[in-house]
Amino acid sequence: MGMNDTPSADRIHIGFFGRRNAGKSSLLNAVTGQNLAVVSDVKGTTTDPVTKTMELLPLGPVMMIDTPGIDDEGELGSLRVRKSYQMLNKTDVAVLVVDGKTGPMPEDEALFQKIREKKIPYALVLNKLDDEEDGDNGSGRLSSQLPPECPVICASARTGRGVNQLKECLARLGKQEENSKRIVGDLIEPADFIILVVPIDKAAPKG
């Protein structure tokens, strides 16, 4: 079976989360090397989760997930925010993308805490730092709680700054989850009614 034929359930799911216009879609495009997600200066361009399968070396087959902004507004916006949070249930590794020019906002901090509650391995990316001299802009409490193997990543989807560092970080975090993937993967959801059929024939194959 080729890499492109790997079932979704056997892939490490990497989700990109953050506020509108934090540059999630641009960063995802930079990581995948493709124009997968629509990019625009207009807030709320991503209205539904977008997925892309790829190979992330040395990890292997992964599924990248772009999500709607967690600060969307209005009745429809609230539904999009809820959908983004629901995607955490399918995420093995989370990427919290923060606008490096403004630093983390309350919505970022709320998402960060939810990611930690779910014990999802994560990386914090300060995006839009086009100048190599631009550094950590007030990530504060968020960066102080990051695992030592993944420090704050200063990045620019436009210039490519930090993209390789992010790939390496995701590969390390993904390795931690690789052996804990469930057999059923994304086939069932919480509260689903499941019937388990067990063969009682002694001649039935084991497994």
Model-derived regions: residue spans:
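Conserved G1/Walker A P-loop phosphate-binding module
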Residues: 1-78, 82-90, 117
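Conserved beta-strand elements of the Class I
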Residues: 15, 193-195
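Solvent-exposed alpha-helical segments within well-ordered globular domains of core cellular machineries
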Residues: 29, 62, 82-89, 106-113, ...
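Helical mechanochemical/support elements of P-loop NTPase systems and associated helical scaffolds
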Residues: 42, 46, 50, 80-90, ...
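Conserved Switch II/interswitch segment of TRAFAC-class P-loop GTPases
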Residues: 72-73, 88-110, 119-136, 160, ...
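Canonical P-loop GTPase G-domain recognition
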Residues: 120-186, 192-193, 202
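Charge-patterned, long linear interaction tracts outside catalytic cores
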Residues: 199-207
